[in-house]
Amino acid sequence: MKSLILAEKPSVARDIADALQINQKRNGYFENNQYIVTWALGHLVTNATPEQYDKNLKEWRLEDLPIIPKYMKTVVIGKTSKQFKTVKALILDNKVKDIIIATDAGREGELVARLILDKVGNKKPIRRLWISSVTKKAIQQGFKNLKDGRQYNDLYYAALARSEADWIVGINATRALTTKYDAQLSLGRVQTPTIQLVNTRQQEINQFKPQQYFTLSLTVKGFDFQLESNQRYTNKETLEQMVNNLKNVDGKIKSVATKHKKSYPQSLYNLTDLQQDMYRRYKIGPKETLNTLQSLYERHKVVTYPRTDSNYLTTDMVDTMKERIQVTMATTYKDQARPLMSKTFSSKMSIFNNQKVSDHHAIIPTEVRPVMSDLSNRELKLYDMIVERFLEALMPPHEYDAITVTLEVAGHTFVLKENVTTVLGFKSIRQGESITEMQQPFSEGDEVKISKTNIREHETTPPEYFNEGSLLKAMENPQNFIQLKDKKYAQTLKQTGGIGTVATRADIIDKLFNMNAIESRDGKIKVTSKGKQILELAPEELTSPLLTAQWEEKLLLIERGKYQAKTFINEMKDFTKDVVNGIKNSDRKYKHDNLTTTECPTCGKFMIKVKTKNGQMLVCQDPSCKTKKNVQRKTNARCPNCKKKLTLFGKGKEAVYRCVCGHSETQAHMDQRMKSKSSGKVSRKEMKKYMNKNEGLDNNPFKDALKNLNL
């Protein structure tokens, strides 16, 4: 009898097979005399669509809403059905005694496995592999500590409740809005409050009125002393009068105070912090950061589990620190890391806190030494940031003397504040940091002359537009960006981690860009006309971050066994009925801001011009029609003059390729250019065909020369 291990992806299945020496490769799985390892391809099973309950629901009609099934159905995803059949056969195989779930250790990973097991009708015992890295050592250690699968039932119930609630609310709200206003509109419990966050910030900026104010400082021996009150004066004349009173008046140093202070390194990275920093430093978006991080985790195995919301480590990891530091010696931080090899680490250090780690600890390097030449430029940047933050967290604090010099002149007090570094501590990790010295020339009681008075004009600045990094942070802490009626609501938002989860926020932002609800101009995220109308047409409660936070709070309670999933789903059904009725009874109107005069060739309605990732297309305004045609799209064809990518306008014989430099050419000319470019060249396929044809011939010098090529 064997144990069947179910991984989430083929790459993880290979890692497990390698760690446990499961060497026999089969079609869709690995096997030895103790284990069988197979895999999902992400989700193999998903919620059924409305038309899979009732074929009449394929057409979107307002009168059919709300769609609330008595029992939720699941279906096998068509494009991965072959692998599902393999997994199903293995689960039901008589030689399999139990199932070991080895999908991602979290809510969604649990759902991936359990939906498959439920669809198959599994009755066999379940055990759970729960690890935060896929190194050989972590896998082997994890298999020594397998958990009873029943310990994770509540996690599964929470995942299932989240999935079903999103289906019930999302399907009905989107269909209701779309059919009511004859437009492609989408609502969701996470995406709609996110649009509201962006809109609120945009309104604050639009309504902001700058105010002018003035400050006063004095220059003494080359040092600037600021007026102690730090008051902003809106009346410049007040300061000018003060300056007149200071003319030809000497000052006196009232005190020189030195206070020794310490500053501590930032917390270790969780996913949101890392995504925010990658955007701030390199303008790399959250989705790209997560994909790169996933590659470092799965392919290279040099970082721990990416989708974590924790900034801390567990105390049982103390003994692994030296090994992790050792691998960082392969990076540009080797000189800074070397002293840490002789340091003793304690579980009392602030980075170790079991209470602040739920599913997964902070993102840190694994014990696998990276092959730096194998990493892409983006992977190198990301890995360096993780190493930098990790090493900083293990270093002693930065120490400095905070010096405050107080100056009195004509009854007014001015201060000079300077910091002098005494111990670099964690700041030694970053390049360019060094010990500083201040040769301040002041002593208590000194009489000093004022060499210059400075009245400076300032203007208050509006809040900044969100960018992809700061929007992530706002989703995590929406209570800092919106007005709430009650302080307890702010606490709810803080405790539940805000809108969405670390694993879903990047996808939500990406989706909002794709549906043209928000847009980014010069890195500034703004709500589009469509996004504003979605907020106006959506039920008010669905635009509030508080509602989704309250739902997330209940999901967490389900996860902890303190709330019934069935109760939560019933609440979502009642909420959905109210939402649909509200939309049905609304007298509001929707106005397409991108409607063209081009008629749809299928149904005759006017088409809408929409932006896509690679250009523009025309889409029928009727969602049930689904007719689309390209207006323009970027191609991989290059301009013969400047070598930039050409944009294609139109199609067929009428198509024209244009470049930003002004070059243009017809489809016929492009075809001719490509033909002449490729003429005389022999393809790899043709060379292989020639080799095979002449396999039995001797004394063929051309064939012998081709043998040395990697074909």
Curated annotation (Swiss-Prot):
Site (Interaction with DNA): W60, W167, R175, R307
S-S bonds: none
Biological process, per Gene Ontology: DNA recombination; DNA repair; DNA topological change
Gene3D superfamilies listed in its UniProt record: 3.40.50.140, Topoisomerase I, domain 2, Topoisomerase I, domain 3, Topoisomerase I, domain 4
Binding site for Mg(2+): E8, D104
Catalytic residue list: Y305 (o-(5'-phospho-dna)-tyrosine intermediate)
Catalytic activity line of the entry: ATP-independent breakage of single-stranded DNA, followed by passage and rejoining
Domain Toprim span(s) in chain numbering: 2-135
Gene Ontology cellular component list: cytoplasmic replication fork
Region Interaction with DNA: start-end pairs: 186-191
Keyword field: DNA-binding, Isomerase, Magnesium, Metal-binding, Topoisomerase
KW Metal-binding (keyword) present: yes
Any one GO MF annotation of this record: magnesium ion binding
Enzyme Commission code: 5.6.2.1
InterPro entries, alphabetized: Topo_IA, Topo_IA_2, Topo_IA_AS, Topo_IA_cen, Topo_IA_cen_sub1, Topo_IA_cen_sub2, Topo_IA_cen_sub3, Topo_IA_core_domain
PROSITE patterns for the chain: TOPO_IA_1, TOPO_IA_2, TOPRIM
Statement: the UniProt record of this protein carries the keyword Phosphoprotein: no
The Topo IA-type catalytic domain, residue ranges: 152-580
Chain spans, region Disordered: 691-711
Names of required cofactors: Mg(2+)
Family label: Belongs to the type IA topoisomerase family.
Summary of the function given for this chain in its UniProt record: Releases the supercoiling and torsional tension of DNA, which is introduced during the DNA replication and transcription, by transiently cleaving and rejoining one strand of the DNA duplex. Introduces a single-strand break via transesterification at a target site in duplex DNA. The scissile phosphodiester is attacked by the catalytic tyrosine of the enzyme, resulting in the formation of a DNA-(5'-phosphotyrosyl)-enzyme intermediate and the expulsion of a 3'-OH DNA strand. The free DNA strand then undergoes passage around the unbroken strand, thus removing DNA supercoils.
Protein name: DNA topoisomerase 3
